[in-house]
Amino acid sequence: MSFEKTPSGTRGARAPSRSNAFTRFIGRMMIKFHRRSGDRFRGMDLLYLTTVGAKTGQKRQTPLARFPDGDGSWLVVASLGGSARNPGWYHNIAAHPDQVWIEVAGHQLRVTAEQLDGEPREVAWQRIVESQPRYAGYQRRTDRVLPILRLSPAQNP
């Protein structure tokens, strides 16, 4: 499923570049740490999102806070800590919507991503902010709308 990408903002928190080897190394170390600590970070349950790079075509894995949405679906927020730009994984999903996987509690599955808009987004946003108030702070840091994606188990082709 494809979606229209939310544009970048003009202001926001500074975000590290994922393009350099050091940042990718730190990302891999963080994933190992999170796995050992029960897939949690700062009080948030995590999932591991795997996408295919929009430019490189290589698989990329990113730990993200997960919010249950029923029927085995999860919500994730493309916040990048309130950066002016959308995270790389968001662009990867837009470029390769049929190549998205998650790992939750040791179970891996292929998913479809749906960007929420309008009332469904607002309802989801309120649930997310009630659960993790830090996301309201991320939104205040930037003038872009933080995309919320629903990741649902993919139907077999």
Regions found by a protein language model. Give the residues of each.
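Alpha-helical membrane-targeting segments
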Residues: 2-45, 140
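A generic structural micro-feature
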Residues: 41, 56-58, 94, 143
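A broad, low-specificity signal marking well-ordered, structured residues that form hydrophobic/aromatic
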Residues: 47, 74, 100, 111, ...
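Short, structured beta-strand-loop surface elements
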Residues: 80-134, 141-145
